[in-house]
Each structure stands twice: as structure tokens, then as C-alpha cells.
Amino acid sequence: MAFDLNNFVIDRVVRGIAVSQGDNEKLGIAKGDVLFSINQITNPSLNCTSESTDAVDALSVPIATFYRAKSAEFSAENALFDMNLIATQSGTKKQVATAATTIDTPCFETIDIEAGKTAYTLAHLPVAEPKVYVLKGDGTLGEKVVVGSAANGTTIVISEKAVTIGDGYAAGSQLFFMYDYIADGTTGNGAVEVMNSANNFPVGCKFIMEILGADVCDQTNLIYAYLVFPNAKLSPDFDWSIATDSTHPFSLKAMQELSLLTM
């Protein structure tokens, strides 16, 4: 007997994948490339609407209704913040630091002063001379530290990654360093970047969502259902609450699928 299904019981959404509809030389994306793949989807919702026009008689009584201009919008949240998703929402691509494509990266670093120790090493090689402050007990910044050519009193010396302090700091005190470094993907020197620019917007995509469920009459055999948007546009609008329990929201609109015929 041919497979048939009517009443479908949903267990959960397994994953959602968006693939590129075409080549994008600017972003280095080829047709069919995965733009993002997420597997922590929560609160998925599909909203379908249309516009109606009523035909009326001489007394303005509706005698017929015609519908046109269908539209569909899908919205959901990913339980985890996803770099590829926000890159697609921003109309760009996630950049990973390598030797060929380095990333200028900011760094906040704290050094704990130990008794009798004057030499310390920064985690990264600064691009320019770091700005240094005394770190107060409540975590706020105190006096600015002078960086000189000789370590004396509260004056310190910075040579590449090496830091030499004077004798003006008590054991247990802290110095706060602010600097930029070049991430090149080597061990301990990696970075990932997503840039949201004013002139970049999401590209068209095909979105496929995998849903796990079962026939209401046979819940022992699980069935995979697929919700497919052949021509979709991810919205660049999103509200991201930056907190431990926050989610990553996204929405997309379904577009009419058109084919360009060539002779």
C-alpha cells in the first residue's frame, strides 16, 4: 500500500537549513552552499495571509469575495546564538582568522601582581602600545599607568608582549591592559568575525526545516516531515537580548518562485 498520512503528531523541530539560490562572488558563496544550519529551534510559527476584495450589489451587500496577494512569514528562535545565522541576517559571511585573512581583534587583559615578580607576559602581541590602568577592587578603572622606557615606581615598560613593572605596585593589585592584536588562526591567536554593515542585506535562499513526528494512529514509527520555502528572504530585522538565557530570533518571508526562461 502506498504511504499516506493525514493526522500528523509533531514531536519537535530537528533542524533548519538555508542554502544559497545562486552564486555570490562578493561573499564567496556558490549556488547550493549552506548559509546557516541550526538545530536548536524553538517557538516556530508560520503566518499565512492574503488580501480580499468583495464584490457588492447595488445596496453594497457583499455577494462574492475574491482572494489574492497571498503571503507567508515564518518566525522562530534558536536557543543558542549562531554566528552563521547572524551573518546571513546581516547580508555577509562569517570570517575565520587565518594567516591569509587576519582579523584585527580587541583584547581586555588583566595582570595580577605577585610579590617579588616584575616581569609579565601579555597573551597577544599588541598592534600599538596598550592603554594601561590600575584595576580597582570593585572592577572599575582607576589611575592611568604611565608606559615609559624604564620601570620605576608606578611606571611600566612594554616591549612587544613583555611587561616590566616598577616597585610601586603591591602584591595582589591588578593592572588592566587594553589593546588590539592581529588574529591569524594560530593556537591561542584565533578569532571569528561577523560585520553588520549599513549597505549589506540578506541574499535570497531556500529554507528547509526538518520536523520529527508520527502518525496519530502509529506513534511507534517516527516520521520526518519537511517544511520547504523554495524562495525565501531572511529579514535583517532582529532583537537580540544579550544574556545567558536569551535566544536568537529570526524571521523570513516566502516569495513567489519565478523562473527565467532563455531561448
Residue ranges and their predicted role:
Residues A2-Q89, K144, N152, A225-P249:
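Solvent-exposed edge beta-strands and adjacent loop segments
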Residues N39, N47-T49, E77-A79, E114, ...:
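A structural detector for beta-sheet-dominated domains
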Residues E73-E77, F176, K206-I208, P249-K253:
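Beta-strand secondary-structure signal
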Residues E25-L27, M83-N84, G168-Q174, G185, ...:
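Short, surface-exposed beta-strand/loop "edge" segments at domain boundaries and coil↔beta transitions
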Residues N78-D82, Y181-A183, I211-D215, N231-P236, ...:
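Beta-strand elements of well-folded, non-transmembrane domains
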Residues A69-E73, G166-F176:
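Extracellular interaction modules
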Residues N84-N152, D180-K206, E210-N221:
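Extended beta-strand solenoid/passenger and fiber regions
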Residues G137-D138, V157-E160, I165-A171, L222-M263:
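Mixed-charge, glycine-accented linear interaction segment located at domain edges/termini
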